[in-house]
């Protein structure tokens, strides 16, 4: 059976994750359409690559949920940020009920390695029919979180960290290039970012036969999930004045860089696994130590930690050990873990192998983010309550929304309106205060 | 056994004092040592020594083991100086034990554990932290880290007598940095005022969960206490608790409530009805992941009428046991492991 999947995403890193998943599913015989929710600043290169590889839609969530073509898919994969994930699940279910259409399985996942706030991320994802995890490491942490809770029945599947098809062995010798995969917030402190580029510059000076290319996460005019004040190009100018001739920024697509370079260095980027895919030797920068805020503990058992400052030169850095196979399996970089597991799990779901009843999210004494806790969900719920003239319920939902977004004046005004006890004044106040725009 | 316990911050000192009392009851001699925070906060039972001098001090040669309950950078500094000083004197460093002195979970626990890895014995609280440690160090050179779960040693969880107030009292734990904006705190304060007004036969007490300066002018604007002092007409049954110590208030309370304070655990252990406010969801910055499985999360508006809380809101005992409540012989466990270590 050929599975037809729809993948929904908005920001660049989520679109990249969808691109990788779509390629993998197509290679396994599945059909994939990607819907990129329009968002200002999304890199054109990312959208262009998606368009070249298969059908690409660009609809808002509201338009997408009203589109009759939605019925043609066997499952929908949602790659959005936490609150939007929960909101999509909730509005999708409501729209299917309204249109009397059957529900398709919804799945979600992560767009790369999860370095922090895993529990919070899961609290937004609970209730999806399947949560895709990177590897046994994440599975173990999910099990720890859900143990002794009513949510133990949450289904998950390990889909691995390999995002690119293995590069065919090339007879062409790789160039003496070190690619540094920049991350916008790791490290985040300006003085540490300056220290990082200074380390790279010293290494470049000690290795005149090499080129050191810093690959910025995004171009200065583009946006990613994290908002940053200082682009890496500015940090480079501030920290070095005139950098060595063999240290440059490169905006060449990462896959192309990795196919011709000998080395990739990173603090904690998922690009490390792209390097493995393309046969480029990765190293993890150990100079900042193992710090939770840098995500480096993830790589503690990798066998790839190296100090840039302590390395004699890049020739010496290249002679290091390979990644530890046990660690690669633990984090999910192993043939056992791939998109094939997702397709199998979705087929099982469709075939009724497992109980397909959605996970019950409301339990006394438990609160999960996914259970109608995004601000928009709360406001939408409040508007529904107002339409039913249940003003106490509307006030209750708006009060929670106001705790989340105390600075949102519209929520405050709407709350004041529903609290109005005089019927006439309340009606008037509801007319003049803004509800949630669709 | 002669032991030294070293702590710097308020939470560390409180935890070490509790551990010292428990170890003393087991027949050990314990010396509490730490840098003096300031003149006003000097405590008579602490030996005040600046950290670098303490780490290199020959005083430590006279104890069997040293419990180092300092935070990240101070701990690194202590271990480095202590190791170097011992090497210069041609002696072995003293056996060191350490561990989180707050009931941490998830990212916060990992961040706390990283600088402690490599000590002779890691003291954790319950099975949950042991499982997390194993997860964190899997495959790393620290995979064989010696560790022991010694229960909820860092909080006053020993049984208390019947000293609850005559009038029903709800104690709301005020975390001065959570929510992190003054405006958000103001909104929460107004909600608590509404709860107090809706419950005239209850007393509602805002209890800071860490010591605040004696001068209220210096209280942070992100504390509920600050908003209470600004309020022109607060409800008559809404009051402020002791600014220096949350314990008496918690003992008197019929019901305790908070967002993610460590101090929610003692009333849970004592069997008092406790509410973890779920209005903000599971947020890492608000310590939500720790209480996710507690079984006592609910939204503020679902807490009314307060009387209904008296017969509900008890935590899931399996969850509480998993956090360390089920371990009743923690100090003995610690001493057994230290004896084996010293040989």
For the regions a protein language model found, what residue spans apply to each?
Chain A
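Leloir-type glycosyltransferase catalytic cores
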Residues: 299-374, 380
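Hydrophobic/aromatic side-chain positions at a characteristic register within alpha-helices
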Residues: 374, 386-387
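Conserved catalytic-core segment of nucleotide-activated headgroup transferases in glycan assembly
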Residues: 17, 163-235
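Active-site and donor-binding regions of nucleotide-sugar-utilizing enzymes
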Residues: 6-28, 35-152, 158, 401-410, ...
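A donor-sugar binding/catalytic signature common to diverse glycosyltransferases
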Residues: 250-295
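Nucleotide-activated donor-binding/catalytic signature segment of Leloir-type glycosyltransferases, i.e.
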Residues: 229-251
């Amino acid at each position: 059976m050929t599975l037809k999947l729809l993948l929904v995403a908005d920001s660049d890193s989520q679109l990249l994750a969808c691109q990788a998943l779509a390629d993998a599913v197509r290679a396994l015989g599945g059909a994939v359409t990607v819907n990129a929710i329009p968002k200002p600043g999304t890199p054109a290169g990312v959208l262009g690559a998606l368009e070249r590889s298969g059908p690409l839609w660009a609809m808002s969530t509201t338009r997408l949920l009203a589109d009759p073509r939605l019925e043609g898919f066997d499952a929908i994969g949602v790659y959005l940020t936490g609150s939007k994930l929960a909101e999509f699940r909730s509005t999708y279910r409501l729209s299917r009920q309204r249109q009397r259409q059957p529900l398709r399985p919804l799945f979600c996942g992560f767009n790369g390695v999860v370095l922090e706030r895993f529990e919070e991320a899961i609290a937004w994802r609970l209730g999806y029919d399947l949560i895709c995890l990177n590897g046994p490491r994440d599975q173990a942490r999910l099990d720890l979180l859900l143990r002794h809770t009513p949510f133990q029945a949450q289904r998950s599947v390990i889909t691995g960290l390999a995002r690119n098809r293995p590069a065919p062995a090339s007879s062409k010798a790789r160039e003496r290039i070190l690619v540094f995969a920049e991350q916008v917030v790791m490290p985040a402190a300006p003085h540490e970012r300056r220290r990082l580029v200074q380390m790279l510059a010293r290494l470049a000076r000690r290795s005149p036969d090499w080129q050191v290319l810093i690959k910025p996460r995004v171009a200065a005019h583009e946006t990613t999930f994290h908002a940053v004040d200082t682009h890496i190009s500015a940090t480079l100018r501030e920290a070095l004045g005139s950098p060595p001739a063999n240290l440059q920024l490169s905006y060449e697509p990462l896959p192309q860089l990795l196919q011709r370079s000998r080395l990739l260095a990173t603090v904690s980027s998922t690009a490390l696994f792209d390097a493995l895919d393309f046969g480029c030797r990765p190293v993890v920068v150990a100079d900042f130590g193992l710090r939770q805020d840098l995500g480096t503990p993830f790589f503690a058992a990798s066998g790839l930690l190296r100090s840039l400052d302590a390395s004699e030169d890049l020739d010496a850095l290249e002679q290091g050990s390979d990644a530890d196979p046990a660690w690669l399996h633990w984090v999910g970089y192993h043939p056992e873990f791939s998109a094939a597991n997702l397709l199998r799990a979705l087929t099982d779901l469709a075939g009724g192998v497992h109980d397909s009843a959605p996970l019950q999210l409301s339990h006394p004494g438990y609160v999960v983010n996914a259970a109608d806790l995004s601000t928009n969900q709360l406001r939408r719920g409040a508007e529904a309550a107002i339409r039913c003239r249940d003003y106490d319920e509307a006030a209750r939902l708006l009060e929670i929304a106001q705790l989340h977004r105390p600075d949102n004046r519209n929520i405050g005004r709407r709350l004041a309106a529903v609290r109005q006890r005089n019927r006439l004044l309340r009606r008037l106040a509801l007319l003049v205060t803004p509800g949630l725009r669709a | 056994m002669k032991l030294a316990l070293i702590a710097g911050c308020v939470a560390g000192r409180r935890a070490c004092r509790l551990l010292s009392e428990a170890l003393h009851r087991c027949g050990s001699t314990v010396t509490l040592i730490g840098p003096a925070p300031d003149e006003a906060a000097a405590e008579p039972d602490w030996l005040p020594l600046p950290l670098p001098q303490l780490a290199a001090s020959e005083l430590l040669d006279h104890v069997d083991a040293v419990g180092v309950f300092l935070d990240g950078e101070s701990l690194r500094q202590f271990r480095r100086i202590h190791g170097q000083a011992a090497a210069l004197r041609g002696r072995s460093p003293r056996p060191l034990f350490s561990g989180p002195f707050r009931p941490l979970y998830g990212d916060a626990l990992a961040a706390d554990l990283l600088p402690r890895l490599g000590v002779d014995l890691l003291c954790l609280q319950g099975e949950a932290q042991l499982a997390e440690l194993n997860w964190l160090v899997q495959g790393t050179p620290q995979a064989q880290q010696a560790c022991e779960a010694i229960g909820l040693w860092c909080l006053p969880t020993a049984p208390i007598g019947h000293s609850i107030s005559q009038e029903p009292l709800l104690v709301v734990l005020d975390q001065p940095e959570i929510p992190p904006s003054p405006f958000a705190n103001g909104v929460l304060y107004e909600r608590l005022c509404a709860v107090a007004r809706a419950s005239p036969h209850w007393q509602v007490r805002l209890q800071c969960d860490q010591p605040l300066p004696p001068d209220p002018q210096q209280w942070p604007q992100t504390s509920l206490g600050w908003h209470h002092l600004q309020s022109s007409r607060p409800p008559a049954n809404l009051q402020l608790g002791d600014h220096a110590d949350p314990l008496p208030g918690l003992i008197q309370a019929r019901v305790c409530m908070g967002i993610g304070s460590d101090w929610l655990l003692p009333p849970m252990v004592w069997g008092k009805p406790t509410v973890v406010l779920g209005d903000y969801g599971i947020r890492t910055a608000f310590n939500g992941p720790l209480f996710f499985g507690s079984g006592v999360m609910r939204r503020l508006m679902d807490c009314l009428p307060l009387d209904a809380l008296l017969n509900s809101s008890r935590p899931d005992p399996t969850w509480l046991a998993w956090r360390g409540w089920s371990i009743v012989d923690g100090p003995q466990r610690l001493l057994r492991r230290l004896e084996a270590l010293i040989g």
